[in-house]
Curated annotation (Swiss-Prot):
Protein name stated in the entry: Large ribosomal subunit protein uL22
Function: This protein binds specifically to 23S rRNA. It makes multiple contacts with different domains of the 23S rRNA in the assembled 50S subunit and ribosome. The globular domain of the protein is located near the polypeptide exit tunnel on the outside of the subunit, while an extended beta-hairpin is found that lines the wall of the exit tunnel in the center of the 70S ribosome.
A Pfam family assignment: Ribosomal_L22
A single GO BP: cytoplasmic translation
Gene Ontology terms, MF aspect: rRNA binding; structural constituent of ribosome
CDD domains listed in its UniProt record: Ribosomal_L22 (cd00336)
Similarity comment text for this entry: Belongs to the universal ribosomal protein uL22 family.
InterPro entries per UniProt: Ribosomal_uL22, Ribosomal_uL22_CS, Ribosomal_uL22_euk/arc, Ribosomal_uL22_sf
Listed GO CC annotations: cytosolic large ribosomal subunit
UniProt subunit comment: Part of the 50S ribosomal subunit.
Keywords: Ribonucleoprotein, Ribosomal protein, RNA-binding, rRNA-binding
Length: 156
């Protein structure tokens, strides 16, 4: 199996906390936009933003894969994009991996008030091939797509 790599950061290895979650049954397209929105944010701000999107108080901006996404009035002008959605399933898994990374940072003794998301990315996972029985002895192939999420928190 290949090793886990990430961009070279100019932060001491002891000031980083990492977390990975693999084979998440969520769309890579939604996860891409969620990761792009919270990259570089402080941990508490990112969690608050994602919880607001879950409660539909604020829409998540969609930069890529936004075909058919409506313009939302509750998107902040700082995003410089008007179309957005509420990808709840993807956000639940991102919150889960952020919580794991926060626990890792806490066990390393990092100050959680000054922790920032230095790296977050979503990658394609494995594709599970399934078959659905049809009439007259036939079957139709069905795919289940998965994704991987990786997070690195750093103390600023």
């Amino acid at each position: 199996m290949a090793g886990w790599t990430y961009p070279k950061l100019d932060i001491d290895e002891n000031k980083l906390a990492k977390a990975v979650i693999k084979n998440v049954p969520a769309s890579i397209r939604d996860l891409y936009n969620v990761c792009k929105a919270i990259r570089g944010m402080k941990l508490n701000d990112a969690k608050q933003f994602l919880n607001n999107v879950l409660e539909e108080k604020e829409a998540l901006p969609f930069w890529k894969h936004s075909h058919g996404a409506s313009h939302r009035s509750n998107i902040s002008p700082k995003w410089k994009v008007k179309s957005g959605r509420y990808p709840k399933k993807a956000i639940k898994y991102v919150l889960k991996v952020l919580e794991n990374a926060e626990n890792n940072a806490n066990s390393k003794g990092l100050d959680l008030e000054n922790v920032k998301i230095v790296h977050i990315a979503a990658h394609k996972g494995i594709i599970l091939k399934r078959y659905m029985p049809r009439a007259f002895g036939r079957s139709t192939r069905k795919y289940r797509y998965t994704s991987h999420i990786e997070v690195i928190l750093g103390e600023v």
